Amino acid sequence: GLLASSYGTSRAFPSLGAPIETLARFYRRTRPDDADVYVAAAGGAIYTYTMGTEGWVKRSEGYKNDVWSFVTYEAVEGGATVDILILSNEKDGMIAVYGSDLRVERKTLTLGENYENVKFAKLGRHAERIWGVGAEGYPDSIFYSRPYDPFTWTDVPETPEMGGGGINQPTWDGD
């Protein structure tokens, strides 16, 4: 569904000019006193809106799908921790919005020799790992990143618990 105002209500955000299909609040753990930031996907682009400002700012464009799955995380940038919003869909792959300057970066995931150009339809976060499912060509696979490293998904043979990887869980009855 698309976001729209209900009868008798007022807008929480300024009009974007295109139907918003994904809306996420940017969680600011490292900068809790900053104004709330919202991230929207509409018309093949990613926008941000900072509460109290005049309108949406286009941060990147050229996407095939406006429906994104997302999780919040942290990254180290210049020795400091920065909040990030990680988004993914099965058409465009993974991107990240960085809280330091709200830039958007495309991410190419390395998942090992057996997997190339994997793009997740859904993301989750558990035990300091990012989990991805719904990758085209891998309907029975669940992938996971290295702990504390959301963009590295390869294994570590010497210490498997520190690596990323995939779990294949085939099903024959649709469960």
Task: Give the ranges of each region predicted by the language model.
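Recognizes the extracellular SEMA beta-propeller fold with strongest preference
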Residues: G1-D175
